[in-house]
């Protein structure tokens, strides 16, 4: 692990910085000249550099080939800049595209931005440098109308092929009431059905060769092994997969667009629905990013409570993943065991938050309320129960010779391939890369906890599922420390932008009463800036990149989810394998479609 510099570790997370002291700024200036860039000061915690469109690919290639390279395109998307009022010192732009690159060896990130005019929405594709740019560029074109020249297949990915318009543009309606009433005529229904017909030629596939015809099989979007509304079109030669095309978007709900119409506070419940098994884990990156904008430092008790709830939901999600993986391989019983154990997690979560799957319990500056009396006993009972149950899963199912035979060596990939496709979480650690955000870039007090990061070597299905078992043990270890070392103190920060403000002060001071009224009715106004927060979520790295224009609502909410990148990788891994191997591979990825489609 590469430590961040002393200046990084001592500066408050919310301080606005230009990061000119980051070595990469000097490297870029030496290579391209200081006049080639505009460095933007933000609260993202990384250098944000505006580059000229003509130099973009050259700059990305340079960073990709440095001695300590930026090996992963972590995220790529766009921003409609036309209504943004706080842009002092930035290049003129109607739209912009940002490229978030990550370096494992440096443990650092950099964000490149390109300014575009509405009359010339073109930029070169980055797919030849980072193959995972494919889906991100398709989505950016679909949402903003920005064309990526040279892209191999620039078509819609989230919306139906018949959709008109670019939904994340500021002039595109955000609510159904702003559209004309929807009417599905028989003719339109036929057109919609026709658009779903898979045409191999559109994807560069052949229907057959001189000697044989290929079969095309739709797996999903309603199939128990597709783990949600997900279609994957298989090109088969007998049982062998020649090629495949994942088809996503059936679960798309416009989560990022909703962020532009909800207050900073009222958007919290929407975060729970991004990865619906993650609960409070989903809320963590959002509230931390908002707190960076606001300049809020939360009490230690809040940090530890957030860690405790996050690890409870991590255990809950991992239990479902392990049991359904075993079911995909062919064993039924562990699923019923797992739901018994998950019920205990939900009972504990419900006792603390009042809700089960979607608690919406974290707040800007704290949590909704303090821990209830008796929480220690409930947590103690669970910590005494769970370790033995984990042992039974391993002994009864995961050491089974049939399961091993179907998963060892299946759908294996190495660290280089994982990084090229943006794989994070257990999928990356199974290849031997010990990258866990909780350890490498601690947040919410994780630096105060003693736990290990399990790592695999083979990068196959069996490694991925066994890593999750070990991660469960480490989560129990973290919960044990929460039980023994829960700090005293308030459950909210004493800050003007804490939302909602402490209610007990509203009847004593007119100023706090006014603040309470405004923040509960209209919502708090966050300072104009940009912030970013990534967390180690249940399925990989989840992050929020927020842009504030000094309003009660976000100007741009970008949600980067791990499952999106993981599904894009499927064709490169599964070509040449059997259909039965694909089922095991899908079960080993650990995804839900709400996390993919947002």
UniProtKB/Swiss-Prot annotation:
InterPro entries: NADH_DH_suC, NADH_DH_suCD, NADH_Q_OxRdtase_suD, NADH_quin_OxRdtase_su_C/D-like, NADH_UbQ_OxRdtase_30kDa_su, NADH_UbQ_OxRdtase_49kDa_CS, NDH1_su_D/H, NiFe-Hase_large. Residues 1-189 are annotated as: NADH dehydrogenase I subunit C. Residues 213-598 are annotated as: NADH dehydrogenase I subunit D. It is found in: Cell inner membrane. The keyword rRNA processing does not apply. One of its GO terms (molecular function) is NAD binding. SUPFAM superfamilies: HydB/Nqo4-like, Nqo5-like. Gene3D superfamilies: Cytochrome-c3 Hydrogenase, chain B, NADH:ubiquinone oxidoreductase, 30kDa subunit. GO terms for cellular component: NADH dehydrogenase complex; plasma membrane. NDH-1 is composed of 13 different subunits. Subunits NuoB, CD, E, F, and G constitute the peripheral sector of the complex. This is NADH-quinone oxidoreductase subunit C/D. The gene is nuoC.
């Amino acid at each position: 692990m590469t430590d961040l510099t002393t200046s990084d570790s001592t500066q408050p997370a919310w301080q606005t910085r230009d990061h000119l002291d980051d070595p990469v700024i000097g490297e870029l200036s030496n290579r391209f000249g200081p006049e080639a860039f505009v460095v933007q000061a933000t609260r993202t915690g990384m250098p944000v550099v505006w580059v000229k469109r003509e130099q973009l690919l050259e700059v990305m290639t340079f960073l990709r080939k440095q001695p300590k390279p930026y090996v992963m395109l972590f995220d790529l998307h766009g921003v409609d800049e036309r209504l943004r009022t706080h842009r002092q010192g930035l290049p003129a732009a109607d739209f912009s595209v940002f490229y978030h690159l990550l370096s494992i060896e440096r443990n650092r990130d950099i964000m490149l931005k390109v300014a575009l005019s509405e009359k010339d929405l073109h930029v070169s594709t980055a797919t030849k440098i980072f193959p995972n740019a494919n889906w991100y560029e398709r989505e950016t074109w679909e949402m903003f109308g920005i064309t990526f020249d040279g892209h191999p297949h620039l078509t819609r990915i989230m919306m139906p092929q018949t959709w008109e318009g670019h939904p994340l543009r500021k002039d595109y309606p955000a609510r159904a009431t702003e559209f004309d009433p929807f009417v599905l005529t028989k003719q339109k229904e036929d057109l919609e059905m026709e658009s779903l017909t898979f045409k191999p030629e559109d994807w560069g596939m052949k229907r057959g060769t001189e000697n044989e015809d290929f079969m095309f099989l739709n797996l999903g979007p309603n199939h128990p092994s597709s783990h949600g509304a997900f279609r994957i079109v298989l090109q088969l030669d007998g049982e062998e997969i020649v090629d495949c095309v994942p088809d996503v978007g059936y679960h798309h709900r416009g989560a990022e667009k909703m962020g532009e119409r909800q207050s900073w506070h009222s958007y919290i419940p929407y975060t729970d629905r991004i990865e619906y098994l993650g609960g409070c884990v989903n809320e963590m990156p959002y509230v931390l990013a908002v707190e960076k904008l606001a300049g809020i430092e939360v009490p230690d008790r809040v940090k530890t409570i957030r860690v405790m709830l996050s690890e409870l939901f991590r255990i809950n999600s991992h239990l479902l993943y392990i049991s359904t993986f075993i079911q995909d391989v062919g064993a039924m019983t562990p699923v019923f065991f797992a739901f018994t154990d998950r019920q205990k997690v939900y009972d504990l979560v419900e006792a603390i938050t009042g809700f089960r799957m979607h608690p919406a319990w974290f707040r800007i500056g704290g949590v909704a309320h303090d821990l209830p009396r008796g929480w220690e006993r409930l947590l103690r009972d669970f910590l005494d129960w769970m370790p033995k149950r984990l042992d039974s899963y391993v002994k009864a199912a995961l050491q089974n010779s049939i399961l091993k035979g179907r998963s060892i060596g299946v759908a294996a990939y190495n660290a280089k391939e994982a990084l090229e496709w943006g794989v994070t979480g257990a999928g990356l650690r199974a290849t031997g890369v010990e990258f866990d955000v909780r350890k490498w870039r601690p947040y919410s007090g994780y630096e105060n906890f003693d736990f290990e990061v399990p790592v695999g070597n083979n990068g196959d299905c069996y490694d991925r599922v066994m890593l999750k078992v070990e991660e469960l043990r480490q989560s129990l270890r973290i919960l044990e420390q929460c039980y023994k070392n829960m700090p005293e103190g308030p459950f909210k920060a004493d800050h003007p932008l804490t939302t909602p403000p402490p209610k007990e002060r509203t009847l004593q001071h007119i100023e706090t009463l006014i603040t309470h009224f405004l923040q509960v009715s209209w919502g708090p106004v966050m300072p104009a800036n940009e912030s970013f927060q990534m967390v180690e979520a249940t399925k990989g790295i989840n992050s929020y990149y927020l842009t504030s224009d000094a309003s009660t609502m976000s100007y741009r909410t970008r949600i980067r989810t791990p499952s999106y990148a993981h599904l894009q990788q499927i064709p490169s891994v599964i070509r040449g394998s059997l259909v039965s191997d694909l089922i095991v591979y899908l079960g080993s990825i650990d995804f839900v479609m709400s996390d993919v489609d947002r």
